[in-house]
Amino acid sequence: IIRDGDANSNIITRFDEISKLLFVKLYAEQNGENIFERIVFENDNMYFERIQEAYSSSVKNAKITIPPTFDRILLPIDTLIKCGNELCKINISSANCDVKGLAYEDTIKGTFDKSDNQQYFTPYQIVNFMVEIMSEYLQGTVCDPACGTAGFLTKVGDVAPLTSLLGLEVDERLAWVSSLNLLIHGNDSFTVRALPNGGSLGNEADSYFGKIDCIITNPPFGSDYTDAGILNKFSLGSGKTSRRRGILFIEQAWRLLRENGTVAIIIDQGVLNAGSNLDVRQFILKHFKILAVIDLPDTAFMPYANVSSSILIMQKAAGKVEQPLTFFAKSQSVGRKSNGDDDIVYSNTGSPSLNSDLPD
């Protein structure tokens, strides 16, 4: 409907408007209203303005932070009316949280996966595995300091509903998407903050130092950070003109965690074996207990990226570090083809399953 009604829209702007409509509908339903149902004698302009006012009101009263650029629905009148005609037929709040969450996640996947925006999206197969393998550490405050669309945090909320969830994100749009994703999943103990000045590597994240119990994240490890003011805050960045963001996230995870807190982070394998990253390995050995290293196949993030990556699981050491026995594994398949589609195999009886050696 939105694509047909607004020729100037693109997949991202359409997603933004869908999210706004879902938000105002959810907010109204919590107050027992079917906001998109027509009122007697209401003409098109009156209907349009009422929905706009309802959205503005819900934005002001919401528990989540919404960027100023998202303070108004940008759909043309006729398109908003057509969307409203469809939305008034359903009650989102009465649906099971799992169903609502899966539906919105599918919309997110269609927007951010297999497109120019894929850098914001971690494949669900890897999300599920990392959260499940970290399940015994999911307590207190669980943070994703590069939360993207909140894939990790929504899964943590499903597995460990008593945790307090914290998402940090440099992009305002993604912070808003994360908040709505968590809200639709039925989470009520979460905070998502947009940190536009350097993201969680910038000064705005300092207030969270030493307060996080567990971190699960897939930072943008393939890009360089060049802000000298920020680089000099890090022992792994001081005196350098640039450093890989993923490397800085390792040090920042150490700062964010409480003593004995744990982190599961996806890293470029160059961190583990490149000569230029010797200082990173020395930092890890000095400050963390290495619990596990799990190599991922090169297809794990294709087609957006063809990179050798690993999941590194560590515990922030309290005092002198004595390295424990470390679990090492190499995955050959994560249930994802090189084009980004699910890699499905069939048993002798015809039952489908993901072609993945990651345990359920």
Give the positions of each predicted feature.
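A conserved structural/catalytic subdomain of Rossmann-like adenosyl-cofactor enzymes
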Residues: 6, 209, 213-360
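Long recognition/docking surfaces used for binding and targeting
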Residues: 18-111
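Short acidic-aromatic active-site loops that bind/stabilize oxyanions
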Residues: 93, 116-123, 239-243
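Conserved S-adenosyl-L-methionine
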Residues: 116-217, 222-224, 267-270, 280-281, ...
